[in-house]
Design a protein with these regions (language model features):
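Alpha-helical structural signal in soluble globular domains
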Residues: 47, 57, 99, 103, ...
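Short active-site oxyanion
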Residues: 55-56, 84-85, 136
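Generic structural signal for small/hydrophobic residues in well-ordered secondary structure
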Residues: 25-26, 48, 66, 86, ...
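Active-site phosphate-binding strand-loop segment of PLP-dependent enzymes
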Residues: 115-174
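Flexible loop residues that form catalytic
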Residues: 62, 91, 142
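Conserved PLP-anchoring active-site segment centered on the Schiff-base-forming lysine
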Residues: 71-131
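Conserved PLP-binding active-site segment in aminotransferase class I/II-type PLP enzymes
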Residues: 1-81, 102
Length: 174
């Protein structure tokens, strides 16, 4: 029997900032009257919305901020209360879980598929059977791979609110 270790390396990203990008950023910093909510941000939001085929886009300082605003908006719109249960992936970014905890909701961790890093549907079924009071599920579409949202809806039913983080899957289709 071989004791040879098998290591797989998955690069998360490559440096894609060109010299031209750096020059443009330096010029912007030197000449801009303001760094946030300026005309370039508005233009980018409009172009991004058009590319996505949606009505509005809102750009914020980070993915952490985006997730906090997203969960806060969902909590208010769907009247989630302190202690309400939200299913989250057991392997994900901390910024998918921290806003749930910051806003007083209870994360329920679901195992993930080792290939897609999306929810393991067998474990999701187990959680749905054990917790009849689940209010939401926070889905992360990782590495450009769209999660099987239809399967999750079939398991959880129409009363569960779906929250989706697609920061790693812009342009992916399902």
């Amino acid at each position: 029997m071989s004791t040879q270790e098998h290591k797989t390396f998955w690069p998360l990203m490559k440096d894609c900032i060109t010299a031209e990008d750096k020059t443009a950023m330096i010029e912007f910093i030197q000449n801009a009257g303001r760094f946030t909510n300026g005309p370039m941000v508005k233009k980018f939001e409009q172009e991004w919305s058009k590319w996505l085929g949606c009505k509005h886009s809102l750009f914020v300082s980070s993915g952490s901020t985006a997730n906090l605003l997203l969960v806060a908006a969902i909590k208010e719109k769907y009247n989630l209360k302190e202690g309400d249960k939200v299913i989250v992936p057991a392997i994900t970014w901390v910024t998918n879980i921290s806003p749930i905890m910051q806003l007083g909701l209870q994360p329920i961790f679901c195992d993930v598929d080792p290939v897609t890093f999306s929810f393991n549907t067998n474990h999701l079924k187990t959680l749905a059977a054990a917790h009849h009071d689940i209010k939401a599920i926070f889905i992360s579409h990782l590495f450009g791979i769209s999660a099987d949202v239809d399967a999750y809806k079939a398991i959880l039913g129409p009363k569960v609110t779906f929250i989706e983080d697609v920061c790693e899957s812009h342009g992916a289709t399902y």
